[in-house]
Curated annotation (Swiss-Prot):
The keyword Acetylation applies. Disulfide bonds: none annotated. The gene is rps101. This is Small ribosomal subunit protein eS1A. Component of the ribosome, a large ribonucleoprotein complex responsible for the synthesis of proteins in the cell. The small ribosomal subunit (SSU) binds messenger RNAs (mRNAs) and translates the encoded message by selecting cognate aminoacyl-transfer RNA (tRNA) molecules. The large subunit (LSU) contains the ribosomal catalytic site termed the peptidyl transferase center (PTC), which catalyzes the formation of peptide bonds, thereby polymerizing the amino acids delivered by tRNAs into a polypeptide chain.
Amino acid sequence: MAVGKNKRLSKGKKGIKKRVVDPFSRKDWYDIKAPAFFEVKNVGKTLVNRTAGLKNANDSLKGRILEVSLADLQKDEEHSFRKVKLRVEDIQGKSCLTSFNGFDMTSDKLRSLVRKWQSTIEANQTIKTTDGYLCRIFVIGFTSRRVNQVKKTTYAQSSQIRAIHQKMFQVIQNQANGCSMKELVQKLIPEVIGRAIEKATNNIYPLQNVFVRKVKILKAPKHDAQKLLELHGESQDVGSKVISDVAPLESV
C-alpha cells in the first residue's frame, strides 16, 4: 500500500465554492473634462479604485495621462488622424479637470503619407509659451512636383533641404513665440503652421502634406485652482468676501 498524499485530490471540503467578487464593485467612474478651448468639454469617463483606507482615489487620478481623438473633441471627422493627450490636474466631485499634455498623429496616417519618388523633410523646434510651457514641435513635409514638370521623381538636393529646414525653424518661431498654450492649440487644429511652411518654402522647392506631426511637452507649469478654473472656463472669485447688502440692479 502506497503511503503519502494523493495530489490529484482537491483541497478542502466538497461542495464549497470559492466566492467570486466582481472587481468593478470596488471601482468608481469619473467624468473627464477637457479644457475650454476644445469644442467638446465632456470627453468620456475613466475608472479608478474606490477610496479605501490610506489609498485615496483622487491621488490615483492626479497625473493620469488620457489620449483622446481630436475628432471627438472638435466634432469633426477630418481630425480623426489627430490624437490629443490630456493630463488630470485636479478632481472636483466626480469630474477630472485636465490640461493639454501633447499632440500626435496616428501611425496609419503617417505611413500613408510616405511614398516613393519624393523626399521626406522633418524638423523640430523647442519653444516656450507665455504661460510657462516648454514644448517641442515636430513638423514633417514631402516634396511635390513643380508646375509642368515631366520628370517622375521629386527628390530635393541637400542644399535645398537645408534651406527648407531653416524656413521651417523660422515659421515655427514666428507662429509660436508670444503665444499661450491655448493660442498655440488653436493654431495647431486648423494646421496654420503647416500652411505657412508650404507658402514660405514654395520658392525653394514645392512641398505637400506639411503637418505638425507631434507636440511634446517638456515642462509644464504648476496649475493652481484659479488658473485651472480659468482654463476650463469656470473662473470665479475664490475666497472673496460676500457682501450681503447690495442694491438691486435696475432693469434694462
